[in-house]
Amino acid sequence: MIDRDDLSKMPFHPSRRQMISGMASAAVLLGGGRAFGQARVQIDQGNVAPLPIAIPNFVAGSPSDSEVGAGVAKVITNNLKRSGLFAPIDQAAYIEKITNIDVPPQFANWKTINAQALVTGRMTRQGDGRLKAEFRLWDVATGQQLAGQQYFTSPEYWRRIAHIISDQIYERLTGEKGYFDSRVVFVDESGAAQHRIKRLALMDQDGANVRYLTRGADLVITPRFSPSTQEITYMEFGQGDPRVYLFNIETGQREIVGNFPGMSFSPRFAPDGQRIIMSLQQGGNSNLFVMDLRSKSTTRLTDTPAIDTSPSYSPDGGRICFESDRGGRPQIYVMGATGGAAQRISFGEGSYSTPVWSPRGDYIAFTKQGGGQFSIGIIKPDGSGERILTSGFHNEGPTFAPNGRVLMFFRDPGGNSGPSLYTIDVSGRNELKVPTPGFASDPAWSPLLS
């Protein structure tokens, strides 16, 4: 079933493919060796002291580009600060004004304000209307250029360039991939608690560029990205039984994923993007099924007198974690991707739900309920190393950043208020609220866009 009513008429941003075509086919390395200098964030060594970093406004090729140059620097600053690993220095403390990025900075001026790393950049309008963005990353102590690249893009995508540069800086100084050039799909909530309108919404990971994918006529929950980031699967309560839908972000078209009798819910893509795993209700039980999106064939993975739901694949697609009450209370189980025997991995007090596998493969995040608290935690796939990251009245729905270092979840204080999105590091530090236009729940973080 293809549904083109209204959705295809909505304004959509260009796809990732179209956005990248506006840039150079390959980023050009402007300098910098592979060796790390003294400016380095030791991300795996316990409590991390944030690295002092200076990020002046990017030099403008013309007066009309000065606002964009300042905007790029601000986005990079906010990204790095929110990661908890960097301490951007206030521009009011700067001694030197960068006017030409082709000339090495006066490093003594940056040492004086205790900067360990320095980012310089330039935004230049090209004859064809495109923007040329350049940046350099410097180790202040050694004077070594650590990275330098240039990009070409349409002017409206300057924020995207800022996220890509943020990822380059993050990776160069931590040794791990960044997560800033990514998006989040979530459920936007508005109206009184008794008559809440819920719409699918999409935004950059920092809360910018929000746009709505559905109009709120029907209740929607549990949106999830495809590996390509161009499709979303979600559950909608429309006429009749709730159904799982597949939504194309680029075209605005959607279709039902299988016309099954009864209720289908908790959908999630396989890592290959060719299959969707979900839970189907049959009588009083719910079992896991996987559907091939091309052939529409389905395979049953579990067959128990219980409720099996919330499945999530391991990054290599070889295993599945899911929630099941087959032992009484809801717990987390792990089994092979083709079904078979399942191993329970959660044994703490209370019940466990909404498991999701980290893109790194090292942890499974979950919601834990017990003692009047809803907690967000992580556990290793073998059941060891359980750790609670944050607790409160109602925390739920964890989702990993593309690099597996940060989690996003939603918190609902109850009453006349509504839910909000938060991020927290897998270490349990740096809990931050994510800005959204209104109430927000059920977040899902995309893979990196580039």
Swiss-Prot record:
Pfam family, one: PD40
SUPFAM superfamilies, per database record: TolB, N-terminal domain, Tricorn protease N-terminal domain
Paired cysteines (S-S): none
UniProt key word Mitochondrion: no
Cellular compartments per GO CC: periplasmic space
Subcellular location: Periplasm
Coiled coil: none
Biological process (GO), any one: protein import
Highest taxon listed in the record's lineage: Bacteria
Description of how the protein assembles with itself and partners: The Tol-Pal system is composed of five core proteins: the inner membrane proteins TolA, TolQ and TolR, the periplasmic protein TolB and the outer membrane protein Pal. They form a network linking the inner and outer membranes and the peptidoglycan layer.
NCBIfam families documented for this protein: propeller_TolB
Name of the protein in its database record: Tol-Pal system protein TolB
Species whose genome carries this gene: Nitrobacter hamburgensis (strain DSM 10229 / NCIMB 13809 / X14)
